[in-house]
Structures are given as structure tokens and as C-alpha cells.
Regions:
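Conserved N-terminal/central alpha/beta ligand/cofactor-binding core
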Residues: 20, 26-27, 32-116, 120, ...
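Beta1/beta-strand and adjacent pyrophosphate-binding region of the FAD-binding site
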Residues: 1-11
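N-terminal Rossmann-fold NAD(P) dinucleotide-binding loop
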Residues: 14
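Buried hydrophobic packing segments
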Residues: 17-21, 152
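Flavin (FAD/FMN)-binding glycine-rich loop and adjacent Rossmann-like elements that form
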Residues: 40, 65, 70, 110-111, ...
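Alpha-helix N-cap/helix-initiation motif
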Residues: 10-11, 85, 133-136
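Membrane-embedded transmembrane-helix bundle of lipid-linked glycan/lipid transferases
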Residues: 6-8, 17, 122, 140-142
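Loop/turn elements at helix/coil->beta-strand transitions in domains of secreted/extracellular proteins
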Residues: 2-4, 24-27, 104-107, 140-141, ...
Length: 215
């Protein structure tokens, strides 16, 4: 069976790509290794996204995602100090699964393993996946890698972009211009993303006495 769009991986990008492709009328197949959708927003528990406080960024599918969660959460989303909004991981999971199930042109198969891939020239023709106890051959016109580690890209030996993009490339207002990329040491020292620091402490000896005070 051949599909208009085949998405490998159900991370945040993979789930969004599958939903949006199906909404545009494409016969879409979503293949995921695990039984969950959403990646960082659900399975990884990163449910207090930062950097999205500006309403002008809350557009498209992301805007619909946030507004739907807000409408369905009586307690609201503004109850954490990390971000202007936060939600429980299962809320993200349930919403994404509901969107997937509502689309007749989108089929989701979970518990899949990427086994092999066939190319003709520079195009993927088909893939073999182990899924639900059988080996299946999948044909598609368009392929999207929505996995965490680029499984499909690596197997296809496909070219990919890594690192910062200049403002001139896509006319992205917030991106650094080409001159800054070439001359500012920050962009060579941090070629992918600014670091996220985590501070951990280790107790030695006995644990401190529990306080008798009540909050």
C-alpha cells in the first residue's frame, strides 16, 4: 500500500507533521516505536515550555494546542514559575492522540521498528518496519523524519542541515544575520543551542533532621 505522506517518529515535530498533513487531505501514515505521542511535550515531561510567552508566536498548530489545553483546564495553565503556561504531560498526550484519531486520512501504527530502506537515486522508495509482530513494506510519496535521533535520515544517508541558519536563508527576523554567524564567537562555541544548566547536589552522611514546622 502506498501513502501520500509517511512520518517516522511521533515526537513533537512528527506528531504535528502527521496531523497537519492529514488535515490538508494527504493520506498519511504515522509510525512510532512507542505507544505515546508528543515527545518532549509528553513522554519527556517538558510541559512548561519556555520562550513562548509572546502571543505572536502562539500561531498555527502550536497556538491551537495551547488554546485547546487552556479551554479544557478549569485551573488554567498559568501556575508555574518556569513559563507563562504549563500543563500535565498526560494532557498533551491525550490531546495529540485525540487529534490523530479524529482524522480519517491519518493512520497511526505504534510499536514499530525501522528495519530497512530502499532508495532509487536520491529518493526513498519504501521502508521495511517490524510492527505488531510482522514485517511490513511501506511505500510513500513524501517522507518525514519526526524521530528524536534522525533514524530515517541516517538510514537513507540523506543530506541534512545542522546548526544555526542565517537570517538571509529564510527571512527569519529573529535569526542572526550572516555577518554575525561568521564573526561572533558565540555561534561557533554554541553551534546548536545555548546550554541548559542543571545544578545537582549530593548529600553525604546522614540526612538532615526533618523540620517540625508545618507549611
Amino acid at each position: 500500500m502506498s501513502w501520500d505522506v509517511v512520518v517516522w517518529g511521533g515526537g513533537t515535530g512528527g506528531a504535528a507533521a502527521a496531523v497537519q498533513a492529514a488535515r490538508k487531505g494527504a493520506r498519511t501514515l504515522l509510525l512510532t516505536p512507542g505507544p505515546w505521542l508528543g515527545g518532549m511535550l509528553s513522554a519527556a515531561g517538558v510541559c512548561a515550555p519556555d520562550g513562548h510567552e509572546l502571543s505572536c508566536w502562539q500561531t498555527g498548530l502550536w497556538g491551537q494546542f495551547i488554546r485547546t489545553l487552556a479551554d479544557e483546564s478549569p485551573e488554567g495553565l498559568d501556575h508555574n514559575w518556569v513559563s507563562c503556561f504549563g500543563f500535565r504531560p498526560e494532557q498533551a498526550e491525550q490531546l495529540l492522540q485525540r487529534w490523530v484519531m479524529q482524522l480519517p486520512s491519518l493512520e497511526w501504527r505504534s510499536g514499530c521498528e525501522l528495519l530497512d530502506l530502499q532508495r532509487r537515486g536520491d529518493r526513498i522508495q519504501s521502508i521495511q518496519v517490524g510492527c505488531q509482530g510482522s514485517t511490513q513494506t511501506i511505500h510513500g510519496a513524501q517522507w518525514i523524519d519526526g524521530s528524536d535521533l534522525g533514524d530515517l535520515i541516517a538510514m537513507a544517508d540523506a543530506p541534512y542541515r545542522w546548526g544555526w541558519e542565517a537570517q538571509e536563508t529564510w527571512n527569519e527576523p529573529s535569526a542572526p544575520d550572516r555577518r554575525r554567524l561568521d564573526q561572533d564567537a558565540f555561534f561557533t562555541e554554541q553551534p546548536v543551542q545555548s546550554p541548559t544548566w542543571v545544578v545537582m547536589g549530593q548529600l553525604s552522611g546522614e540526612c538532615p533532621a526533618q523540620s517540625s514546622q508545618t507549611p
